[in-house]
């Protein structure tokens, strides 16, 4: 699997698109808003920002969320500017980054014809992997990234023994768990090294990563949602609808870290100070437009399955082909509903606010 080419959320605006099924991601951005506001406020109140404010959203995806975070950041700065009595807005440079397969066209079609901020705002698309350099040195003042850094640059090497699974699970050999962790360490270190060159001294980063509280890498806190998809695929293997060999070669390029693991990589790389780190949670039932659940477990399970389909379909399509898609997601939906009827399932988020050290 060539992750750079295959990994992207389902584009367009159809029923199963990411644009129509990214409500939980929007709520996570809202949950982290106090941390993001505190970081941008501290940045703008100091002497790092003068006439230009460069903000990058890494892993912006498409749909309504692509502009949500940066819009909120600009609003915060404008409110603060007026309170501080500063006459002129900074010129805003906004960089929206994702892998080349992202639906950037949809983002730019959604832009307002005229800026609705007092200052000048320049918006740029930046296709490419954030596991590499994206910007010149000392370009950025603020980086935001939400629900992106759990994706790895590649499927870990040496996990051929992960048969019957598509991700980390309690049935995985220890070697598989170790391989996933090693890939996370390599990727996260590279991410931090690249950003250290691109962010100005005193600049800020707020990163929200799908993760876990537990130090158990195979904890259901982070792995259950993929285990249920593996069960749906294995049902189809047992019925002869999917080749077992093909199933055994499919693995999700993702690692959901604990706060301890994230902190360890930041301290090891050494270019950023940790201003704040915490874990939060959000229930699966929040995969609705209003985010309050409140429907039947069947409705909630259906919404979770659609949210996950918008994320996972491009990966499945590339490996298994189109013929299995409707069947596997129908089975997946039923398994999700069954699990949600028995327990309050939730996602764990690791949120970290960082300050670029002076060289």
Swiss-Prot record:
It catalyses: salicylate + S-adenosyl-L-methionine = methyl salicylate + S-adenosyl-L-homocysteine. Keywords: Magnesium, Metal-binding, Methyltransferase, S-adenosyl-L-methionine, Transferase. GO terms for molecular function: metal ion binding; methyltransferase activity. Pfam families: Methyltransf_7 (PF03492). It comes from the Eukaryota. Substrate binds at residues 18, 21-25, 147-151, 255. GO terms for biological process: methylation. S-adenosyl-L-methionine binds at residues 18, 59-61, 65, 96-99, 129-131, 146-148. Mg(2+) binds at residues 162, 248, 250-251. Signal peptide: none annotated. InterPro entries: MeTrfase_7 (IPR005299), MeTrfase_capping (IPR042086), SAM-dependent_MTases_sf (IPR029063). Its EC number is 2.1.1.274. Belongs to the methyltransferase superfamily. SABATH family. Catalyzes the methylation of the free carboxyl end of the plant hormone salicylic acid (SA). Converts SA to SA methyl ester (MSA). The volatile compound MSA is hypothesized to act as an airborne signal that triggers defense responses in uninfected plants. MSA is an important chemoattractant for moth pollinated flowering plants. This is Salicylate carboxymethyltransferase. The gene is SAMT.
């Amino acid at each position: 699997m060539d992750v750079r080419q295959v990994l992207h959320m389902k584009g367009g605006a159809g029923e199963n698109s990411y644009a129509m099924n990214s409500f939980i991601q929007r709520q996570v951005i809202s949950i982290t808003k106090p941390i993001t506001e505190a970081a941008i406020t501290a940045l703008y109140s100091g002497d790092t920002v003068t006439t230009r404010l460069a903000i990058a959203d890494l892993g912006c995806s498409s749909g309504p969320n692509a502009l949500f975070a940066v819009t909120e950041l600009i609003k915060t700065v404008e409110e603060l500017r007026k309170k501080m009595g500063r006459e002129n807005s900074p010129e805003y440079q906004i960089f929206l980054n994702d892998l080349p397969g992202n639906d950037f066209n949809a983002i730019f079609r959604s832009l307002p014809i005229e800026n609705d901020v007092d200052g000048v705002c320049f918006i740029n698309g930046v296709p490419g992997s954030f596991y590499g350099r994206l910007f010149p040195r000392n370009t950025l003042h603020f980086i935001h990234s939400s629900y992106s850094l759990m994706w790895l640059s590649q499927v870990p090497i040496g996990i051929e023994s992960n048969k019957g699974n598509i991700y980390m699970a309690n049935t995985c050999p220890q070697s598989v768990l170790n391989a996933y962790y090693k890939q996370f360490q390599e990727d996260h270190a590279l991410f931090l090294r690249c950003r250290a060159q691109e962010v100005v001294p005193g600049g800020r980063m707020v990163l929200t990563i799908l993760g876990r509280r537990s130090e158990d890498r195979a904890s259901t806190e982070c792995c259950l949602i993929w285990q249920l998809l593996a069960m749906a695929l294995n049902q189809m293997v047992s019925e002869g609808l999917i080749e077992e060999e093909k199933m055994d070669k499919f693995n999700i390029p993702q690692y959901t870290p604990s706060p301890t693991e994230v902190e360890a990589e930041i301290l090891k790389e050494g270019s950023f100070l940790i201003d704040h780190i915490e874990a939060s949670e959000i229930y699966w039932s929040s995969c609705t437009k209003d985010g309050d659940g409140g429907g039947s477990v069947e409705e909630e399970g259906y919404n979770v399955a659609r949210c996950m389909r918008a994320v996972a379909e491009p990966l499945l399509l590339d490996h298994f082909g189109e013929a299995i898609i409707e069947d596997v997601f129908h089975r997946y939906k039923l398994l999700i509903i069954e699990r949600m009827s028995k327990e309050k399932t939730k996602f764990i988020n690791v949120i970290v606010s960082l300050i670029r050290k002076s060289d």
